[in-house]
Amino acid sequence: MTTSTDRLSVTVAENKQPYFVEWADSFGPKIAGVKIIFWSFFFGAIGLFYRAIKSLNSRERMLSTLAFTLFLTSIIFSRYSGNSTFNGTNGLSLLFYALGPIVLLATLGYYYRLHYKSGEQERLKNIEFSSIFVLCFFLISLISARGGIRLVMMLVPAASILAAYLSVEIASLALNTEKSTKRTISIICAGIIIVAFIFSGYQFYKTSVATAAGYIPSPYNQQWQKAMAWVRESTPPNAVFGHWWDYGYWVQTLGERATVLDGGNAKSYWNHLMGRYALTGTSNKEALEFLYAHNTTHFLIDSTDIGKYSAFSSIGSDKNYDRVSFFATFNQDLSQIQERKNSTVFLYSGGVLLDADIIYEDNGTRIFLPEGTAALGALLIEKSSTTGEMISQPVGIFVNQDRQYNLPLRYAFDGELKDFGSGIESGVFFIPRLINGANGLQIQDDGSLLYLSSRAVNSQFARLYFYNEVNPNFELVHSEDDFFVAEIKKQVPSFNSSIISYDALRGPIKIWEIHYPSDIEFKKEYLSEEWPPELLRV
């Protein structure tokens, strides 16, 4: 089963429908491979159900509890993992998922009818309402957690109640048991569970402390705080910011300025328009017309948008996914440097499937590399041995059906955009890389590069953020360096790049002030809030 099937939802990580092996880890820790909290609330729910129906006879209680156990198991384990028999989408998984509630409802319905026909339905009124309420709360929370990662937190209160109930019930059983053997066993079980809970709490504490420490400093309390301080102090109070939706609340709260998009996705179709025209489009005019319709005064791009390009290019595509693309990272392989008479050839290794077909004529031979099947495996960059500048076009090493094709790329950016006038409509963008050398961390100039396919190489995003295009309509008014990049610049004054590759791509927050041409037209269609049906579904 899938819960999020529209373009926007499937690109939001929190909306992903989790597998059991993913969300169950939130209810650890493990002792000898056993998830303590998970199994505590699992058996706690079964125990509470058994207690709730104590007005029934032994046989009825036992069979009803078994039906409830099957019901609980079907909800949890019918979506176990992506590579298991129960992956949540195949026929067997769906059958098992449906079997649980069917068996439970059939069992309870059968006993209700039995008591009704015998005139004993009054016994059913003795079922504990409070227990049923807790179980309903738990089941709603459990189904919600199964439906989306962001809803796993809803399971925490109910799971905590049931885990605590299990320990209290076992402790109560130990205290009220007269037989010494049962009493001893119950006390031992209760002790083990209580100690396990204490251990779990301590492990959660350690994990939380370590996680919190890893987030300090973070982009939110360093780079974004500083960038938004500039926004508050240097832009008018009625300024309106355009950017990808992820940062809407940050700009609104930290920068105290209005935004076109926000984290709540109240008008999600505008995400499509922002992605299509302002970020992935190649027309400066269309980008301005969209932003003008929303009274946008400033435009913002954050370095994390580099990794999100695949998301907003998907959301911004037409029904044929004409904009879908990504920025693939390739790293320089120091073991495969080729020295020539007056130049050096560097190999950048990586690997990515093509996002669009490539058709290229080479000496009268037509080369066809299909999207999704052919791949780019590496890139060759030739530089002068004396000046260090590129002296020839980048060459992509493409592979299709066990055949290799070395094809030239038309564009390259190494301080400035170079258009070689021929080659496939793709390019590379060089980035310094921080590596662990013999003497500690070392900066490797042009140690990494991004491959920009034909769909992305001339996009608004690439031209503004990567190439620093001088655009009369988009004036760069502020650039806030990543915390790590800022520290490098302090220690290495000669370092002049705003982007570096270290664990991830670290770059600036760039803000442009928009200057609209006098003849720009207002287009009402950019204010539409309704998704065309053909664009909504994946």
Segment roles from a protein language model:
Residues 2-116, 128-134:
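Alpha-helical transmembrane segments at the extracellular/periplasmic loop-to-helix junctions
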Residues 47-54, 140-148:
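Hydrophobic alpha-helical transmembrane segments
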Residues 49-58, 107-123, 160-188:
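Membrane-interface junctions at the ends of membrane-embedded or membrane-associated helices
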Residues 68-81, 139-146, 195-201:
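Aromatic-anchored segments of alpha-helical transmembrane domains
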Residues 90-103, 144-178, 184-187:
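Hydrophobic/aromatic-rich transmembrane helices and adjacent perimembrane loops
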Residues 124, 134-139, 280-282:
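Short linear interaction motifs
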Residues 177-538:
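Extracytoplasmic
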